[in-house]
Amino acid sequence: MSKAFLVLADGTVFEGTSIGAEGSTIGETVFTTGMTGYLETLTDPSYFGQIVTQTFPLIGNYGVIPEDFESRKCFLKGYIVRELCSLPSNFRCQSDLDSYLKSQNIVGIAEIDTRALTKKLRESGVMNGMIISGIEKPVIENSLLEKIKAYRVEQSVETVSTSTQLSEKQNVVKDYPEINHHIFHSDKQIKIVLWDFGAKYNIPRELEKRNAEVITVPYSYTADDILKLDPDGIMLSNGPGDPADNTGVIAEIAKLVQYNIDAQASGKKMVPIFGICLGHQLLALARGCKTSKLKYGHRGGNHPVKEVETGRVFITSQNHGYAVQCDNLPSFAKLAFYNSNDKTCEGITYTDIPAFSVQFHPEACGGPHDTNFLFDKFIQNILTNKEAK
């Protein structure tokens, strides 16, 4: 393998070997603590614009399994591992990870001290970086560092969202027709609109398990477009980037909130809302809350959160670099979950309308299923609302 280098914005250089595509890439360097689930990480749209470091030292053991993908492609900017397995073993394996990275044109680096890198990011905060391969040694000049520092994740939701409305058997993973997690049955009880800001495949899977018809719509849809579909519930999906950048979407979510407030006042049908990750942040912003960037984010499948009402602690899967500020929440926004490590907001219940949201991923693919019951709560909100009207 040829040499590769990771150059951080502060001038720190890590030397390793090239994996995946050869070339260079710039992104926000982050780390994830997941021991497994690297395929879900690679195909999670929430990693758009980021160079992802796997803290677990050996990656690729079970190869590439298309059934485990969480979106149509890799959206991350680069990939960092300590050691890449070249001889995977799994009865479902279709190729090795290095070949897949090449096919997705993902520039990566292996054989670096990922523990030292993770400690640096933990102590200094996430920072931009550049992976360079195919050269003997990088020339570290101010112009290069300025280029790295200037990088910003932009147009993230626009890039990862679906471009068209999908429903029923249209919503199939095109490249792998044998996968049926987006083929829905016909005996539906309820209709849910999934507003796609970078949705992982496991979100509609979980809704379909609960006998819901799921209509996936692009980020560019308006509140009126969604209400014309006459949904029983609205799911606000996960996604990448700074939530505050999505001013247009936030304004449309505010209209949905106002629709529910008006419907409740007039005795009409309300539409329950459930937000996950970015969807949680966007709903909070639409309701007057504020968000801020975390020092190094929460990424991985082992993050403890505490439920305020019961005091129970759940282990959750997380992938976010921003959080809703807990201080001075509006009176109608009740803190439902908080992070046991740093006390940041992990969930909000809105008392004036049938809406709630969580920062973590209850669909957890990969990761723990401790909070899978939140999908049941969403469905129950919908059924209760339908029965009441």
Task: Please report, for each region that a protein language model flagged, where it lies by residue.
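RNA-binding accessory domains that recognize and position tRNA/RNA substrates
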Residues: 1-191, 195-229, 243, 251, ...
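Short clusters of small/polar residues that mark proteolytic maturation junctions
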Residues: 18-19, 56, 318, 340, ...
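Proline-centered loop/turn at the N-terminus of a beta-strand
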Residues: 107, 191, 272-274, 290, ...
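Short, flexible hinge/linker loops that cap or flank conserved catalytic cores
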Residues: 184-188, 267, 349-350
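Active-site-proximal beta-strand elements of phosphoester/diester hydrolases
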Residues: 191-196, 316-317, 356-360
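Cysteine-nucleophile active-site neighborhood
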Residues: 233, 237-323, 367-385
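Catalytic beta-strand/loop cores that center a nucleophilic Ser/Cys/Thr
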Residues: 311-353, 389
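A glycine-centered loop/beta-turn motif at secondary-structure junctions
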Residues: 347-389
